[in-house]
Structures are given as structure tokens and as C-alpha cells.
Amino acid sequence: MARYTGPAWKLSRRLGISLSGTGKELEKRPYAPGPHGPNQRKKLSEYGLQLQEKQKLRHMYGMTERQFRRTFDQAGKMPGKHGENFMILLEARLDNLVYRMGLARTRRAARQLVNHGHITVDGSRVDIPSYRVKPGQTISVREKSNNLVVVKEAIEVNNFVPEYLTFDADKLEATYTRHAERAELPAEINEALIVEFYSR
């Protein structure tokens, strides 16, 4: 299944979650798009709930189904809770950490920064958004990309960087000090439903 490239706001309303991180999609119309308005939502079956939760998380991180499932399977080989490990691996993606640093307003924009070669890891350019960052590694904006308008604008509006990143705004770099803990990850996701979905 290909990565979704359509209108993010429409998808956010359909899934009932803000994919932009701003919440603006759901402020005026907190219901799925369509001609029937707020009364069209149907009660989902158990399978429907599991599928919806899986889709919410997959689209939140902007991944294809193949990438998503591969990461899920990798998490199952780790010690500990499968669902939590899965969330931790998703959070360690390079494009996501660029977003968490505040270098981009959305994960989609962060993925473009990585794709276009503006980001380095430990001084080496990495243009693979799914690159898994390890604790202790440092993520930076390439020196020739420091003056990108999109980066400057994102930095101006960002007021939160998670504790597992130590961010230097002057250098536009951050060290991934440790893996995220479950309490630091999206609370609106029930990863147990996703484990159930793939266990069917």
C-alpha cells in the first residue's frame, strides 16, 4: 500500500486525529468528511476499531503499510511489550526526530528535509527518512541548509522538545540521548488494538 499523499486535513477528520500536530483540522468540524455531517459516524466492529487504530498510527508517522508492518515485526523480536516496543521504534525514525526537534512543522515536511539531503547524523548526510537513530547519535541540519526559510519558521513556532532529545537551537542539532518512554508517546493511540489486529 502506497503512502497517502492526499489532503492531510481530510484524512485527519476521517481518522479523528490531528495529523498536522496543530489540532486545527478538528476544531470546526470534528467529524469525518462527507455529505452527512456529524451524524454519519457508525459504530465500528471490533475489527473496525483495530483497523482504525492501525491506520491512525500509520498515517501519523507517514508510512507505507509495508514499512509499518516490517517495523511491527521487528518490535516483536525485542524483549518487553510488543506494542510499546513498536511505538518506540516508530519514534526513533529520523524523519520523526527531525519533526520532534522542531525543524519542521509536520512529519511530512520533516520527511522532505531528510529526502532532500538537508540532515546529517553524526556528521554524515542521511537521506533515508526511515533511518533508525540510536541513542547517543547527533542529528544536525547541514551547514549549507541552516538558512532554509522552512526551518527558521518552524523553529520560531516550536516551544517543546521532548526530554529524550537535547536540542541546541543555535547549532540546529540535537542528541538522541535515549529511547522514548511510553508516557512520552502519543496518548491517543491504543497500541494494544494494533497488536490484536496483526495477530488475527
Curated annotation (Swiss-Prot):
SMART domains: Ribosomal_S4, S4. InterPro entries: Ribosomal_uS4, Ribosomal_uS4_bac-type, Ribosomal_uS4_CS, Ribosomal_uS4_N, S4_RNA-bd, S4_RNA-bd_sf. One of the primary rRNA binding proteins, it binds directly to 16S rRNA where it nucleates assembly of the body of the 30S subunit. CDD domains: S4. The keyword Ribonucleoprotein applies. This is Small ribosomal subunit protein uS4. Keywords: Ribonucleoprotein, Ribosomal protein, RNA-binding, rRNA-binding. The keyword Glycoprotein does not apply. It comes from the Bacteria. GO terms for molecular function: rRNA binding; structural constituent of ribosome. GO terms for biological process: ribosomal small subunit biogenesis; translation. Residues 92-152 form the S4 RNA-binding domain. GO terms for cellular component: small ribosomal subunit. Part of the 30S ribosomal subunit. Contacts protein S5. The interaction surface between S4 and S5 is involved in control of translational fidelity. PROSITE patterns: RIBOSOMAL_S4, S4. Residues 22-42 are annotated as: Disordered. Belongs to the universal ribosomal protein uS4 family.
